[in-house]
Each structure stands twice: as structure tokens, then as C-alpha cells.
């Protein structure tokens, strides 16, 4: 009985350390110099819900918490509602998927930056005086945001694969210790 309790505590501590590592990584990724929209944040929103066997909705909020912590440091902005809303929709979408495999991961890694691009740039168009409030202005906003979208796509696919492969290696390594 005692070894089962120890294993549960050890597992809980390892999970806590992993989640803390992800939070620090995601926050730091916004604080260090990087190309625009080239961070692991969307990949974190895609991957984090799969870290827990018995998932809860709290895991959906972790990327938003990371955004909030980094916004405390770098400053709040007028598009926070659109940004946080996009991450909430991404998180809820991912949360409803039960099994992670490479095909699912790649699909989510392409869909999630697209969700972010559509929502956040709609917010830019709606709130910025730069664009006319008609279809031409909306299209102009989306076209001018394409380089940022490209960075989001590449970084999300790249970081999602890194997270997925790291998870696979850790699971394989931990299983081999007990066999």
C-alpha cells in the first residue's frame, strides 16, 4: 500500500513539474526576442490537454494564464479579448478530442493557428481605425496578416512535434525502466 501511495505522490509531483515547466516555457517564449508570432503558445494550447489522463477544463486555461502572466510583464493591449478568446476556442476544441496521435496532432497544429488568425485579425479589423469597415477593409487586414499567420503555422507545427516526440520519448523511457 505504501509503495502505491509513493508512486501516486511521485506521479503527481512529476506532473506538477511538467506543467510548471510548460508554464515557464510558454511565458518566457513571449518575453525573449522572437520573430512575430513564432512562439510555442498555440502548440502549448494544442498539446497541454493531452498531458493529463483524467483531463479537466482547467488545463484549457493554462495557455491563457501564460498569456496573462506575460501580458503583466510586457503590457496589456487592446486585442486581449480577441487573443484570449481565440485561445479559449482552441483549448475547448482540443479538449473535446479524446486521443492524441500524429495525424490528430498535425490537424490541430494546422487548425489552431487558423482559428487564432481568423479571430484575432477580425478583432484587429473591428477595432483599428486603419481599416475601412467593409469587406475590402476586412480582406486587407487578413492579407496584411498573412506573414504572421505563416509564422504561427510553422511554429505551431514545429513545437507541437517537439512536444509530441518528447512526450513519446519520456513515456518509452519510463516504461523501459520498469520492464
Give the predicted meaning of each segment.
Residues 1-12:
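N-terminal amphipathic/basic-hydrophobic helices that include classical n-h-c signal peptides
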Residues 11-51, 57-58:
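Hydrophobic transmembrane alpha-helices
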Residues 16-21, 57-61, 81-85, 106-110, ...:
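Hydrophobic alpha-helical transmembrane segments
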Residues 24-27, 47, 64-68, 106, ...:
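Residue-level signature of the transmembrane alpha-helical core
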Residues 28, 48-54, 92-101, 165-172:
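Structural signal for the C-terminal ends of transmembrane alpha-helices
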Residues 29-39, 63-96:
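Interfacial aromatic-anchored transmembrane helix boundaries in multi-pass membrane proteins
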Residues 62-63, 82-121:
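Short helix-perturbing small/polar motifs within transmembrane alpha-helices
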Residues 102-179:
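Membrane-embedded alpha-helical hairpins and interfacial helices in multi-pass inner-membrane proteins
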Amino acid at each position: 500500500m505504501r509503495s502505491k501511495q509513493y508512486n501516486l505522490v511521485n506521479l503527481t509531483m512529476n506532473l506538477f513539474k511538467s506543467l510548471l515547466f510548460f508554464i515557464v516555457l510558454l511565458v518566457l517564449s513571449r518575453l525573449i526576442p522572437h520573430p512575430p508570432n513564432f512562439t510555442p503558445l498555440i502548440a502549448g494550447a494544442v498539446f497541454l490537454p493531452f498531458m493529463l489522463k483524467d483531463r479537466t477544463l482547467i488545463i484549457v486555461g493554462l495557455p491563457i494564464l501564460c498569456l496573462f502572466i506575460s501580458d503583466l510583464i510586457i503590457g496589456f493591449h487592446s486585442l486581449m479579448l480577441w487573443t484570449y478568446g481565440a485561445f479559449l476556442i482552441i483549448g475547448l476544441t482540443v479538449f473535446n478530442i479524446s486521443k492524441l496521435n500524429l495525424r490528430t496532432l498535425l490537424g490541430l497544429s494546422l487548425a489552431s493557428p487558423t482559428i487564432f488568425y481568423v479571430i484575432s485579425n477580425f478583432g484587429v479589423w473591428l477595432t483599428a481605425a486603419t481599416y475601412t469597415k467593409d469587406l475590402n477593409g476586412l480582406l486587407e487586414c487578413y492579407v496584411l496578416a498573412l506573414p504572421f499567420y505563416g509564422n504561427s503555422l510553422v511554429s505551431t507545427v514545429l513545437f507541437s512535434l517537439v512536444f509530441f516526440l518528447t512526450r513519446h520519448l519520456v513515456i518509452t523511457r519510463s516504461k523501459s525502466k520498469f520492464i
